[in-house]
């Protein structure tokens, strides 16, 4: 009997966590706020793209985007950068914590007058990294 109650309580907790997460997302959309936190990857780019496109459909009022990221996948950051430039509403970007590497690409998508920084924000920009591997004959192709 105790095991059954415990399982039900765990299921209720998971259900409540999901409902709370949905409530928070709804509140963020109502206030036209997007948060980018952590590693930038394809999954994050898809999520942010959906949010920005949805906010554009909801109206032309400015969107506030908070960013705290040490970087990640360059092409994912390029996607977010391009969407910010593409949508009609003004996007105000606020840097907090670290804004580095691929995160800088996103931060720079806002017009200069729409970029803000909290007092303890640190920025880091570097040259793109890349390279080739393989047989010299294959690389020469």
Q: Where do the model's predicted regions map?
A:
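Terminal-region recognition feature
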Residues: 1-141
